[in-house]
Structure formats: structure tokens, C-alpha cells
A protein has these predicted regions:
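Catalytic strand-loop segment that frames the active site of acyl-thioester-processing enzymes
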Residues: 1-34, 51
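HotDog/MaoC-like acyl-thioester-processing domains
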Residues: 2-5, 11-17, 72-73, 84-140
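Hydrophobic beta-strand-centered segment that forms part of the acyl-chain substrate-binding groove
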Residues: 12, 32, 43-86, 90-92, ...
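Hydrophobic residues in beta-strands and at strand termini
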Residues: 21-22, 67, 117-119
Length: 140
């Protein structure tokens, strides 16, 4: 399992998704479920992938993921994304998750993972991505 990068005290990338974690999103221990969080991360990454591909995409892989801290019910959960690289028909997107309580400005990194998407056509077959990308999508 890869070591989670905690070296940067600020989120990397563009804020793609901000959502309030509710009681219905909690696991039996009372913390927000990891499965719920992965769903939010996939949604955030898909926004970027669909924009880059100018159309439909499919999640091909999710890289290793570990959690630094649990998310409390009532937390504001933010998913930040940045494009790592592009292939002929794929995009690698890093998603960082940060959380904070609504009344607090102090945010904490929760997790990060790399998501790989492929562009697909209407028949769900892999298709090439047009080579042009916007500055907002370009890798660092």
C-alpha cells in the first residue's frame, strides 16, 4: 500500500465537489462510510474526465487508498482534483479529500487516490480523446 502524501498542508488542484456528510452516510461506528467517500471521489474525478474527453467516460481503475482520519457526521467534505496525465483514450486524475466542520476554517486531509478513466462512445467502446486540453485541465 502506498504512503499517503501529507506533506502539503493545502489541497492540490481544483475544488470539484463540496458536500455535507449526513447521518445517513455514516457506518455502524458513527463515522462517515469509506464506501460513501469513494463514491464522492469518483463523482469528482468523473467531472474532470468527462470535460477532458468531451463526452462519456468510464472508471477503469482506482489506485491504493488509505485514510488519515475519520470524517465526522456534519463535516463539510471537499474533493479536489488535478490531472496527472493523459493517454490516447485515458486520463489519470488525482483526487484529494479534505474535511472540516461547518463552523471551523481548519481543514484536514482525509485521503487521496488516483482514478483512471477511459473515454467511451455510445456503444460503450473505448474511443480516443481529442488531443487539445484547456489550461485548467493540464497537468502541473
Amino acid at each position: 500500500m502506498k504512503k499517503l502524501d501529507e506533506s502539503n498542508p493545502e489541497p492540490r488542484g481544483e475544488l470539484q465537489l463540496r458536500i455535507l456528510a449526513n447521518r445517513t452516510d455514516a457506518n455502524i461506528s458513527g463515522d462517515i462510510s469509506g464506501g460513501w467517500l469513494v463514491t464522492q471521489m469518483d463523482s469528482a474525478a468523473s467531472i474532470v474526465a468527462n470535460r477532458i474527453a468531451r463526452g462519456r467516460t468510464a472508471t477503469m481503475a482506482i489506485g491504493d487508498m488509505s485514510f488519515i482520519r475519520p470524517i465526522k457526521v456534519g463535516s463539510v467534505v471537499c474533493c479536489y482534483t488535478h490531472l496527472i496525465s493523459m493517454g490516447r483514450s485515458s486520463a489519470r486524475i488525482m483526487v484529494e479529500v479534505w474535511s472540516r466542520m461547518p463552523e471551523d476554517e481548519l481543514r484536514h486531509k482525509v485521503t487521496e487516490a488516483e482514478f483512471v478513466y477511459v473515454a467511451i462512445d455510445d456503444n460503450r467502446r473505448i474511443r480516443p480523446i481529442e488531443p487539445r486540453i484547456s489550461r485548467a485541465d493540464s497537468p502541473d
